[in-house]
Structures are given as C-alpha cells and as structure tokens.
Amino acid sequence: MNKAELIDVLTTKMGTDRRQATAAVENVVDTIVRAVHKGDSVTITGFGVFEQRRRAARVARNPRTGETVKVKPTSVPAFRPGAQFKAVISGAQKLPADGPAVKRGVTAGPAKKAAKKAPAKKAAAKKTATKAAAKKAPAKKAATKAPAKKAATKAPAKKAATKAPAKKAATKAPAKKAAAKAPAKKAATKAPAKKAAAKKAPAKKGRR
C-alpha cells in the first residue's frame, strides 16, 4: 500500500473527501518526523514507537573497491512495534472485523496470560523429567548388581576348567612313553632280517 492508496482507504473510513484525508496523513507523518528529528519518541499505544537511534563510529568496506572506509557516528530513525501489533501479526491475538485493530488496554491481557502459561508448562516438563530420572536410577543399580552375581558363579567354573587340562596332561605323558617304546621293538626285529640276508649271499657264490 502506498500513500495514495492509504489516502483512499482513509477517505472511505472517515466518510470525508480526499483533500481532508490527504491533509490528515501528511500532518501525522510531518509530526512524527519533526519529533524524532528533535530526539523525541512518538508512542502510539498498541501500534509502536518511533524514535531516534544513535550509531557509533565504525569501520566499513566499500563493496566496489574493497577499500576500508571509516564511518562517522550518526543517528538513524527506528520503529519498535508494540505488543498488540506483534500479537496481531503473529496470530496470538485475533484481528477484529470491525473497529480499530489496536486498542488501549487490550495488549496487557493476552500477552501476560501467554507469558504466565509458558513457565507453567516448562515446570511440568521439568517435573516429569525428574520423575523419569528417579525411575531410571534403580534400573541402573539393578543392572550393575546382575553382572556381580554372574561373575561370582563364573569363578568356580574357571577353577574346574583349569583342573581338567591337568588331568589330560597326566594321561598324555604315558602315551608318549609308549610311543617311544614302539620304534625300539621295530628296530630289534629288523636287525636279524639283515643278518639273514648276509648269510644267504655266500650260498649263491658257491653254486657258480
């Protein structure tokens, strides 16, 4: 909406001619600009505050050349929207179909109610979180206790396991001794066989 469109809307709402609506808009704007220029603030309840803000000296950069430029301290106009204006735009407050969009005294009710309701929900969330933590703590204690019992039962099993290999080793020792004996007997039986072969050789020589 531009200035001309704003004047048209005011002409219809005020039920007056265009000249009077134009004068009303221009006078309002002129008054705000002059007051802010002086350093004063213009407050419209429910709508917002027009004020002057002071900016300190700073260092900026030229976007074209990339050079560093020193900016002197300056004053800029600023607008702070009111609580009721914010509530209407955000949807927290319903915009009335008829009458003024913002009224004096309407802001305090919904804004305070919403502010009080939020901490209540936060406190409830904290309460449930502490309850959950309290329930969770015994579960952890029980979990740590269970492995302790398991370890206690496991200890005798290890002792038995170490005994078993000892018996096995004891039985294995005679087996090796027997194995060593066996080749000795074989060697003993093999020796006469060679002797017999030596005796047989001279017999062949005599026949020739």
From Swiss-Prot:
Major location category of this protein? cytoplasm
Q: Where is this region: Disordered?
A: 96-208
Question: Which GO terms fall under molecular function for this chain's record?
Answer: DNA binding; ferroxidase activity; structural constituent of chromatin
- What does UniProt say on post-translational modification here? In addition to the identifed modifications, is also methylated on one of Arg-53; Arg-54 or Arg-55.
Q: What's the catalysed reaction?
A: 4 Fe(2+) + O2 + 4 H(+) = 4 Fe(3+) + 2 H2O
**Which parts of the sequence are annotated with region: Bacterial histone-like domain?**
1-90
EC class, as a word, reads oxidoreductase
Q: According to the UniProt entry, which residues carry N6-methyllysine? A: 3, 86, 94, 103
Q: Which cell locations does it reside in?
A: Cytoplasm, Nucleoid; Secreted, Cell wall
**Phenotype caused by lack of the gene:** No visible growth phenotype in logarithmic or stationary phase. Bacterial density in stationary phase is decreased, cell surface is altered, increased accumulation of trehalose-6-monomycolate (TMM) and alpha- and alpha'-mycolic acid methyl esters in stationary phase (growth in LB). No visible change in nucleoid organization. Loss of phenotypically drug-resistant cells on isoniazid (INH); up-regulation of 77 genes. Does not grow at 10 degrees Celsius. 100-fold decreased resistance to 12.5 mM H(2)O(2); the major bactericidal effect of H(2)O(2) depends on iron.
**Which example biological process does GO assign this protein?**
DNA replication
The consequence of residue 55 to A is: Significantly reduces protein level in vivo
SMART domains membership: BHL
The known regulators of its activity are described as:
Trans-stilbene derivative 4,4'-[(E)-ethene-1,2 diylbis({5[(phenylcarbonyl)amino]benzene-2,1-diyl}sulfonylimino)] dibenzoic acid (SD1) inhibits DNA binding at 50 uM. SD1 does not inhibit growth in a range of 3-1600 uM.
Question: Which keywords belong to this entry?
Answer: Acetylation, Cell wall, Cytoplasm, DNA condensation, DNA replication, DNA-binding, Iron, Iron storage, Methylation, Oxidoreductase, Secreted, Transcription, Transcription regulation
Source species, domain of life:
Bacteria
Tell me which EC number(s) this protein carries. Answer: 1.16.3.1
What causes induction of this gene?
Expressed at high levels after a shift to 10 degrees Celsius; visible after 2-3 hours rises until it reaches 20-25% of cellular protein (at protein level). Induced in 10-day old anaerobic dormant culture (at protein level). Transcribed at high levels in logarithmic growth, decreases in stationary phase.
Where in this protein does the record put region C-terminus, required for nucleoid localization?
92-208
Where is the sequence biased in composition, kind Basic residues? Answer: 113-208
- Region annotated Degenerate repeats region sits at 101-205
- Describe the task this protein carries out: A nucleoid-associated protein (NAP) that plays a crucial role in local chromosome architecture. Helps organize newly replicated oriC proximal regions and contributes to the timing of replication initiation and coordinating replication with chromosome segregation. There are between 30,000-60,000 molecules in a log phase cell; the protein-DNA complex is dynamic during the cell cycle, with more complexes near the cell ends. Binds irregularly along the chromosome with higher binding near the origin of replication (oriC) and lowest binding near the chromosome terminus (ter).
What protein family does this chain belong to?
A: Belongs to the bacterial histone-like protein family. Long actinobacterial subfamily.
Record note on domains = Both the N-terminus (residues 1-97) and the C-terminus (residues 119-208) bind dsDNA. Deletion of the C-terminus (residues 92-208) has no phenotype in rich medium but leads to 90% decreased growth on isoniazid; protein no longer associates with the nucleoid, instead is free in the cytoplasm. The C-terminal deletion strain binds DNA in a non-discrete fashion. The C-terminal deletion strain has a delay in replication initiation.
Query: What does the subunit comment say?
Result: May form oligomers. Interacts with RNase E (rne).
Which protein are we looking at?
DNA-binding protein HupB
Phylogenetic classification of the source organism: Bacteria, Bacillati, Actinomycetota, Actinomycetes, Mycobacteriales
Q: Which gene encodes it?
A: hup
